[in-house]
A protein has these predicted regions:
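Short alpha-helix
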Residues: 197-212
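C-terminal helical/coil "lid" or tail adjacent to the Rossmann-like core of SAM-dependent
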Residues: 16-17, 217-271
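A short acidic, Gly/Pro-enriched loop at the edge of an enzyme's catalytic core
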Residues: 113-122
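A short SAM/SAH-binding and catalytic strip from SAM-dependent methyltransferases
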Residues: 121-134, 157
């Protein structure tokens, strides 16, 4: 087992970060399947040096290792801005003696400063929607790729991600949540537009990819049946709470969103609610 840990100019997470992180959601089977499909789309088994950008608890890294034919010939750079997530990833692979993983704590926009080696593939799962300067970050990613290197990313935050038949459910969910906030907590969200809610169309994403020096090789938009667990667990995630209920204290937002979505699933007698995922695989031009 070989491991290099690089901690880069990011403050350690506090306890609230641990309480409201992405960990519980990222372990759900449906979500793992979404990311597994992206790795297959990217032909990940052909790469030897791979960046898992926004690695979280190491779930994607683990999936990458399961898809390559010889892990001893693969180097993975597991990158995340959160020290909590880096710690979870470290723990996940603590017993693996056969893999070479470099852990780098860094924001996506600072990766070029913290990783100087050229790589074959950058995998960027469900995070690109948080980045304000997408073109700048993608250009930096391209600069870090070998000639013909691959960028693979996905997101469920884009214009058109909600199928029309789900709009009534989502409106009801928000109405119920706002009612509970008003009646039980005397709180209402503040008007705010966080980055993940400034949504681009799939065509916008393609244009940005091309302008950043890539050629789009594959693009898919898939309808995913998200179970109640998915909506329940995403409602414990800080960025989701701040996105749908900006200004509401996280602990209150979490409880309200989880209670109302659970009740609404029961009320409507449904087991899943659809959401679309956009996946793009591009090569360095």
């Amino acid at each position: 087992f070989k491991c290099i840990i690089l901690i880069m100019d990011i403050n350690s997470d506090n306890n609230s970060g641990k309480k409201f992180n992405f960990d519980s959601f990222s372990n759900l089977d449906f979500y793992r399947n979404v990311n597994s499909q992206l790795l297959d789309l990217a032909d990940i088994d052909k790469s030897k040096k791979i960046v898992d950008l926004g690695c979280g608890n190491g779930g994607i890294t683990e999936m990458i290792l399961s898809k390559v034919s010889d892990v001893s010939k693969v180097v993975i750079y597991a990158v995340d801005s959160s020290s909590t997530m880096i710690s979870l990833a470290l723990k996940r692979f603590g017993d693996r003696k056969d893999v070479f993983i470099n852990y780098i704590q860094s924001e996506a926009q600072n990766l070029h400063e913290n990783l100087k080696e050229k790589v074959d593939t950058v995998v960027y799962c469900n995070s690109i929607h948080y980045v304000p300067e997408k073109e700048s970050v993608l250009r930096q990613i391209g600069d870090g790729l070998s000639e013909g290197g691959v960028l693979a990313f996905n997101t469920s935050f884009f214009d058109g991600a909600h199928p029309k038949e789900t709009e009534l459910f989502l409106r009801k969910w928000m109405m119920k949540s706002l009612r509970v906030l008003r009646n039980e907590y005397n709180i209402k969200p503040v008007k705010s537009k966080v980055q993940s809610r400034i949504q681009l169309t799939p065509e916008n994403y393609e244009d940005i990819v091309v302008k950043s020096g890539f050629s789009v090789k594959k693009k898919t938009i898939k309808n995913i049946k998200v179970p109640l667990d998915g909506w329940y667990e995403i409602s414990s995630f800080k960025d989701w709470i701040e996105g749908v209920l900006p200004g509401v204290p996280l602990d209150i937002g979490k409880k309200v969103l989880q209670d109302t979505v659970t009740n609404l699933f029961k009320e409507l007698n449904i087991s899943t609610l659809d959401r679309k995922w956009l996946s793009i695989v591009a090569s360095k031009s």
